[in-house]
Design a protein with these regions (language model features):
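Active-site beta3 strand of CheY-like receiver
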Residues: 49-55, 60
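Alpha4 helix (beta4-alpha4-beta5 surface) of REC/receiver domains from two-component response regulators
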Residues: 67, 88-103
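Short amphipathic alpha-helix used as the core "switch/output" element in two-component signaling
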Residues: 44, 66-78
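Short hydrophobic/Thr-rich beta-strand motif most characteristic of the beta2 strand and flanking loop
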Residues: 11, 29-37, 45
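Active-site residues of response regulator receiver
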Residues: 11, 57-58, 85
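C-terminal output helix
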Residues: 91, 109-118
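Conserved acidic segment of CheY-like receiver
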Residues: 3-16, 20-24
Length: 156
């Protein structure tokens, strides 16, 4: 991987934050640019550092996880978000997903599973672009093979 993924962690549980930060840094793929124990600090870290990925719990003192997401949207920070929370109810998961959360994992969770979800969250846009371009090439090849003029498809 040519560039490390920048991450902000936000969790009130210091033990979890520390363990996750160490696991992320050990992979060599991630650069933890912010580590917050409350929602206000998380929102500030996000605004200042503009990470590619946010990993947070919804239960944060000061400003809850939904407030953090709203503040990031106001600050126009575009990032992927993975929520790791004991608050795992259908309505809450649905609300989180509607606010742009990529993945929602229940606590407690295995760090290896969380790392996999984080990688997927960051790479999900890239994969769909590649798939879209591959499909476009395939359709173009079939159209040319059949003999349909290029302008019918909409370009040359």
């Amino acid at each position: 991987m040519d560039k490390r993924i920048t991450v902000v962690l936000a969790d009130a549980n210091e033990e979890f934050r520390t363990a996750l930060k160490q696991a992320l840094e050990a992979t060599g793929e991630f650069d933890v640019v912010g580590c917050a124990a409350d929602g206000l600090a998380a929102a500030q870290d996000i605004a200042e550092r503009k990470p590619q990925l946010l990993v947070m719990d919804l239960l944060l003192p000061g400003l809850d996880g939904f407030g953090v997401l709203e503040q990031a949207a106001k600050d126009k920070v575009q990032m992927k978000t993975v929520v790791v929370s004991a608050l795992y109810r259908d309505q809450i998961v649905s609300q989180a997903m509607s606010r742009g959360v990529s993945f929602f994992m229940p606590k407690p969770c295995e760090l290896t599973s969380l790392l996999d979800q984080m990688r997927r969250a960051v790479n999900e846009g890239e994969e769909s672009e590649d798939e879209s371009q591959a499909l476009e090439r395939e359709v173009t090849a079939v159209i040319h093979e059949v003999g349909v003029p290029a302008h019918i498809k909409g370009y040359q």
